[in-house]
Design a protein with these regions (language model features):
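Aromatic-rich membrane-interfacial microdomains
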Residues: 751-762
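Mature N-terminal, pre-catalytic/accessory segment of carbohydrate-active enzymes
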Residues: 1-152, 819
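An acidic-aromatic loop/edge-strand motif
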Residues: 2-63, 67-72, 545-546, 553-563, ...
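Carbohydrate-binding surfaces of carbohydrate-active enzymes
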Residues: 1, 20, 32, 140-154, ...
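Short, hydrophobic/aromatic-enriched beta-strand segments in well-ordered soluble domains
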Residues: 98-103, 649-655, 718-720, 774-781
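Exposed aromatic-hydrophobic patches
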Residues: 637-640, 761-766
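Aromatic-lined ligand-binding clefts that engage carbohydrates, nucleic acids, or primary amines
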Residues: 610, 722-748, 755, 775-779
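Exposed beta-strand face motif in extracellular beta-rich ectodomains
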Residues: 648, 731, 771-773
Length: 819
């Protein structure tokens, strides 16, 4: 819907445009102070990333505050002068701050909007403005009649970078109605200057507040104000959007995260919740702790979105996948696979590629590219995309018809985060709280368990019985409180009910001891503390506190798992941060999706399955080929080897009719190392020029003294002969390491397979002949070196030059062995 994001357009009336209350501050000392209103308005410039040049500004409130606030004071109001051309204040002796609260109207514009939808952002807290905006589309498109009727599945809405949309007419009345007290006295305590993408600016300004005022006033009122904004957003955008979609025969598909959206609950209201997975540098190679961007692929919001979807019993978890804002031309198809697999591990089962780059023929070679991986017929690896597409389709079909299993619920400290730091711009939060927040669910799934995030609302609406916390179709035996300090009393009471019914609660690092919000704070604090203290005293074995992890998250969780009997769905003998397992059920099938997301290492582990699962027939389903084989599994255990970037479905079902997985053929007693001279032919992808030379050793081709290689992209064919006395003794060719490319084998001129990820091993059984054989290994490189070389004369290549690593390692490195 619309163009660019967030929603907006040139035709919006002023009262429909995005609004912000922005604080201008001036330090003053004793005596008369005078300032012009125009000067104040001139200082009201929110440093947003996508500003409009001519926002409307209106001075609404003026407040004089002491510079150093040790105890709460409302300050002195000079609102009566807000309409004056000149503002005069008699300042008492000492240091003070004048706060001028300016309403900015239409201050931000649509990001990358096309003509007709590139003007000011619509006020997402104004339901009537949102509805008029949406109706303009449906009035023109006629979704419910004509050619489009029944042809459009869903209306899509991107994530919400609203950049500080904190105001709407009637905000004071809405706040008081919902929170039971007035927001007006707390203006200097709550409203902050907003910078890029809605994040608060880090500069010092205004008053300094004592720790007591920060704790007892600012954090509690801030919590309430964010909740009011969250409620208004749901009522005025999410509910309006849903209703508009359904009136027009459409499903709602939204990336429901950002400031003012609950990262779990908002996805529960949607027909198709969506998240996003990115290709960042290091995918498949690094996975640093407490660094949510480090090699993950999935964004930190994915687990929140998928949890909300599962809680709402949605069978589709959509994902904007393969988003790419830097590594455009150096991304390999192998990295695309790893990113997609990781996306699935975060709960995704419906991938929307970002994006196919369609360009007119008159554009340069690289064409139009905007934030997406280079899925384009001009890419070197485009001819090999189909195998990945088939693989992805099989994975998605299986997961969409299965249910992810989780018996551990994680309550993240969202309320504490919002109180202390404010709501965050997910999926790129300014603050991660606690530091390991996005690593905990990973460790759970890397250790064979399954988990969902839950919210306080979910807990309160859950039933408890038989040691389980039940919400809809979801059921949990264990609740992990992730450094949660604050709860609503009703949430604490429901947690107490869960423990009393036999459930287990593990409080990580901290034990809840206070309530939420400003009104009746002392009473709520006492109530929460009393409930939790009683639970700890009454059931010390079922409500336990453990130290927070320090460093080795996986080791910490393995200890927790063993000590508190967190029975995994399958016991994994050798844990690794790059190996993760998800467990699903489909009817009476038990489905394990096991992924090695390391591009560099194979993984060897032993899986031990529960007796009731192991009693069924075990199968391995190969999503790359669609082939299924039965497994000969003994004593409920399976020795599993995953080559780099490999994923397997291990499926248990009652059907025992099928072929057994063939045992690996024994290695030849006399393997042949293909050392010596290789004849090399390099064909440029763009101009089709060829170069030929010979190598005595397989090396990174950039180490050779050939200037043309510095800008090369295309295919490199390595050819040599090998004499084979007994062809039946050899069944595999291992091509070793390929630098950043796709590997293809030809034996005596006949195709013998393509390896676009993982181990470069080829089945050559029956393909060799006695005597001399001609082997050709074709490597298809990425575009990065060519793109770097074209930056001087091609705008698209120049735009992404900053992210391309010049002289990316190139070619076949081997060793090449026939066995």
């Amino acid at each position: 819907v619309g163009s660019g994001w967030p929603f907006g357009a040139e035709y919006l009336a002023p009262e429909e445009q995005v609004q912000m209350l922005y604080p201008v501050t001036v330090d003053v000392k004793g005596g008369r102070f005078t300032i012009g209103r125009d000067e104040v308005l001139g200082m009201a410039n929110a440093q947003v990333a996508n500003p409009r040049s001519n926002p409307t500004k209106e001075l609404l409130f003026i407040r004089l505050m002491p510079k150093h606030v040790a105890h709460f004071t409302e300050g002195v109001s000079y609102d009566e002068q807000a309409g004056n051309d000149t503002i005069t204040v008699d300042v008492p002796e000492g240091e003070h701050v004048l706060y001028f609260f300016v309403k900015l109207n239409g201050y931000s514009r649509v990001i990358l909007g096309a003509p007709g939808a590139s003007g000011p952002v619509v006020n997402h807290l104004d339901g009537k403005a949102v509805e008029r905006y949406l109706d303009k589309f449906s009035d023109a498109m006629h979704f419910t009649r004509g050619k489009l009727k029944g042809e459009i599945r869903a209306a899509f809405c991107d994530s919400f970078e609203l950049e500080g949309n904190n105001w709407t007419p009637g905000m004071f009345a809405e706040f008081e109605k919902r929170m039971g007290y007035s927001l007006y006295p707390f203006l200097p305590y709550v409203f902050q200057r907003t910078g890029a993408m809605g994040e608060p600016v880090r500069e010092a300004y205004g008053c300094s507040f004592s720790p007591e005022v920060t704790r007892d006033v600012i954090e509690r009122v801030r919590h309430d104000f964010w909740h009011v904004q969250m409620q208004l957003f749901k009522e005025n955008f999410i509910d309006v959007y849903n209703a508009w979609c359904h009136r027009n025969g459409l499903k709602s598909r939204i990336q429901a995260y950002g400031h003012q959206l609950h990262p779990i609950e908002t996805s529960m209201y949607l027909d198709i919740p969506e998240c996003e997975s990115w290709i960042h540098d290091g995918i498949g190679r690094v996975m640093e702790p407490n660094q949510y961007l480090s090699g993950r692929g999935y964004s930190m919001v994915n687990k929140f979105v998928s949890s909300g979807a599962f809680l709402a019993n949605r069978n589709i978890v959509s994902c904007e996948e393969q988003t790419n804002v830097g590594n455009i031309f150096q991304t390999t198809l192998e990295e695309v696979k790893v990113t997609g697999d990781r996306s699935n591990l975060s709960g995704v089962n419906h991938s929307v590629l970002h994006g196919f780059n369609y360009s007119p023929r008159q554009k340069d070679f690289f064409g139009w590219i905007q934030f997406g991986t280079y899925f384009n017929e001009n890419n070197t690896w485009w001819p090999y995309v189909r195998p990945w597409m088939d693989y992805k389709a099989r994975v998605s079909a299986l997961l969409q018809n299965s249910v992810y299993q989780a018996d551990i619920a994680i309550l993240p400290p969202l309320e504490d985060l919002w109180s202390i730091h404010g709501m965050q711009r997910d999926p790129y939060p300014g603050v991660t709280y606690p530091a390991y927040a996005n690593d905990l669910w990973e460790a759970v799934q890397q250790s064979g368990n399954g988990c969902d995030y839950v919210s306080e609302k979910v807990i309160c609406q859950s039933s408890v019985a038989g040691g389980r916390l039940r919400f809809g179709s979801r059921s949990y035996k264990t609740l992990l409180l992730m450094e949660v300090e604050s709860l609503e009393p009703r949430t604490a009471a429901r947690i107490a009910d869960f423990v009393a019914a036999g459930g287990r609660v593990i409080a990580i690092g901290k034990v809840p001891h206070k309530g939420l919000g400003f009104r009746d704070a002392a009473a709520k604090d006492a109530r929460v503390k009393a409930i939790i203290d009683r639970v700890v005293t009454t059931w010390p074995d079922r409500f336990v506190r453990v130290d927070a992890p320090q460093g080795d998250m996986l080791g910490w969780y393995r200890t927790l798992q063993a000590e508190y009997g967190l029975t995994p769905y399958a016991k994994i003998s050798d844990l690794d941060r790059f190996m993760m397992m998800n467990y699903y059920k489909s009817g009476d099938r038990d489905i394990y999706f096991v992924v090695n997301s390391s591009i560099e290492r194979s993984m060897q582990t032993r899986l031990e399955f529960p007796a009731e699962v192991a009693a069924k027939q075990a199968w391995v389903w190969d999503a790359e080929t669609g082939v299924r084989h039965m497994l000969d599994m003994r004593n409920g255990t399976l020795e599993l080897c995953l080559t780099p970037a490999e994923a397997k479905f291990i499926v248990f079902e009652k059907d025992r009719g099928g072929q057994m997985l063939p045992a690996p053929a024994p290695r030849s007693a006399n393997p042949i190392a293909l050392n010596g001279i290789w004849d090399v032919r390099a064909t440029h992808h763009v101009d089709k020029s060829t170069r030929e030379f010979s190598l005595t050793d397989l090396v990174d081709l950039h180490s050779l003294p050939f200037p043309w290689l510095q800008s090369f992209a295309g295919t490199i064919e390595y050819t040599r002969t090998v004499d084979v006395e007994d062809p039946a003794a050899y069944h595999t060719l291992d091509a070793g390491l390929t630098h950043n490319g796709i590997t293809e084998l030809f034996v005596n001129g006949e195709p013998a397979g393509v390896r676009w990820y993982g181990a470069r091993t080829f089945d050559v059984a029956g393909k060799l002949r006695k005597g001399t054989n001609v082997l050709t290994i074709r490597v298809t490189t990425v575009l990065t070196n060519y793109a770097k070389a074209r930056a001087a004369d091609t705008p698209t290549a120049a735009r992404w030059e900053w992210a391309q690593r010049l002289n990316k390692e190139l070619g076949l490195r081997g060793p090449v062995i026939l066995y």
